[in-house]
């Protein structure tokens, strides 16, 4: 497989998971669109590693590999296809590599919501720093917004297992609903760089739709007009 085909495969994989992006990428500056999709594809890799089911050892090994790869990007070398688009960006890749091991700890059960956010603080801060280097100065509490989006993704992927101990009282569905409400309260709207704000608007809409269903991890079809409206507002900040 050629490098170009391998890169397209990773980008298409992310687009297939976020098909609504086709409606929203118009709100991202044209010169930033390719980089944004490549970056979000990498972020999705980290989310998948965090939310792995079963034996975590292969995921942990993959995380260690990514740490080495990101440090190579700092040295202007790359092996992964995504590096074709991302490695040339002068971003703090080493800072992100240093934060990746925190995902091991973030995967473990937490006592409360504060602890869940704290476990992701360094990782989210490193991602916010990379995004600032890529797309310009962020708005608002960029790192906190990223952490909230990661936890919302984890809520949908891991179910009751992700709930902090203080949120596991009584019925599982009710507990999931209650913690989703807490995450939404702590998720700053329209924070971060423009591409992140647009993606977060989509992620938040999905999260709210999943929360509204009786099957908590099921996602109802999102209404295109409403989604475009949210994307436009997010882009404007």
PLM regions: where:
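Catalytic cores of Mg2+-dependent Asp-rich isoprenoid enzymes
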Residues: 1-68, 72-84, 96, 100, ...
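Long, charge-dense
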Residues: 89-93
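Acidic/His metal-coordination segments adjacent to aromatic residues that form catalytic metal sites
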Residues: 101-113
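Conserved, surface-exposed functional patches that form binding/active-site neighborhoods
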Residues: 154-160
